[in-house]
Amino acid sequence: MGRQIALTKEQEEKIIYNYTILHYGQKKAGAFIPVSDSVVRRILKKYNIPIKSIQETNINKLWVKHDYFQNQSPDMGYWLGILGSDGSVNTKENQIYIELQRQDKELLEKLNTTIENERPIKDYETGKGYKNSKLYFYSKQIKQDLAKYHIVPNKTYSKDYGFPELLNPKYYKDYIRGLFDGDGSIKMTGNSITWQVDVGTIDIAYEIQRIFKTNQIDVEISFLHKKNVTIYRIYGYGKKKCQKIYNWLYNTSSSLWLERKKKKFEELLK
């Protein structure tokens, strides 16, 4: 029987990091030494780390910044809002995806750049002729981190879906701006302007109302029923109030927003 290659503690930890965090395959995980696949497997078994199937390894071949949602920032808060409104988390797999209409593809491109996602955005046309774009990636770490902020699988019916109370309050405006870009609108209603955003739970609606109140802006909540699901709409009516909302939402160090909505907002405020 051949003599086993002796590795240092640091080398073993690096192999484990490459395999579990960076999602490298067995060969790539040990390439920095270099050692063979069998040596990598021995180290993984030594520390009781499950060996991935070929399918799992192939899914994780393309890179994504797995730790992105572990560090709060204005941009991170914004992406929580986008994912909370338009994102989907797969129940069984570690897949997260967002589908938007093609005209908003710029937003997906920004997110792809932010999380360093190597998977290209997919453009497609639905059976009804709608042109959409889809971004997706696989990450166990991001799925776990999003759950801490109550962005979970099957969010329409999940009791775990809710307001991200772990988010620093100074990033609330960025989170709400993300929700607005995902499920909100600015429009003329009668002779004045209405700003609105739809959310999936009354808790989120009340919390957003409270946040606006803290910033001297009064908004209302209404209830809509769509396909046996209750939607909670937060809205502000009137040019003066909408001007306050605009000033607050876009007074941020982040440069993330949906350009067409911001431009329409500005045009209606003229």
Model features per residue range: what roles?
Residues M1-K270:
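Internal intein/HINT superfamily modules and their associated LAGLIDADG
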